[in-house]
Regions:
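Active-site beta3 strand of CheY-like receiver
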Residues: 52-58
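Acidic catalytic/metal-coordinating carboxylates
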Residues: 41-44, 67-70
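Receiver (REC) domain active-site loop signature in two-component systems and cognate sites
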Residues: 63
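C-terminal output helix
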Residues: 94, 112-121
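Two-component/phosphorelay signaling modules centered on CheY-like receiver
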Residues: 18-37
């Protein structure tokens, strides 16, 4: 997968799976992103968003404790201009619709290596 690098952007990766976080970090770093932080739960994501204020958040939907959708809701309540991309191995239309209604800017499915990430990041950063 050869994608053109973008201008630098800071990102927060939220996933309870270390493997999934590493995969996202690798892809996003390859296209010009700088890791602002990692979170393993929804609660952790909300706190880290408040402290780090990244340009983009990549949030898993299903996590123990606070789900990604609830963390998205809390982040959007904190900052209505937050740019959150939901990530899941589940392609459930109801979850996608709910995430978009609550303010998610995009939705991608795992594995992230098969996603046109530079195009998605460019789109989300421009809106």
């Amino acid at each position: 997968m050869q994608e053109k690098a973008l201008e630098t952007f800071k990102f927060l990766v939220v996933d309870d799976s270390e493997f999934a976080r590493r995969a996202l970090i690798k892809v996003l770093s390859h296209i010009g992103g700088t890791l602002a932080g990692e979170a393993v739960s929804g609660q952790d994501a909300v706190q880290k968003y408040k402290n780090l204020r990244p340009d983009l958040v990549f949030m898993d939907i299903t996590m123990p404790g606070m789900e990604g959708i609830d963390a998205l809701d809390a982040i959007m309540h904190e900052d209505g201009a937050a740019r959150v991309v939901m990530v899941s191995s589940l392609g459930h239309n109801d979850l996608v619709k709910d995430a978009l209604k609550k303010g998610a800017k995009h939705f991608i499915t795992k594995p992230v290596q098969n996603v046109p990430m530079a195009e998605i990041v460019r789109f989300v950063l421009s809106h």
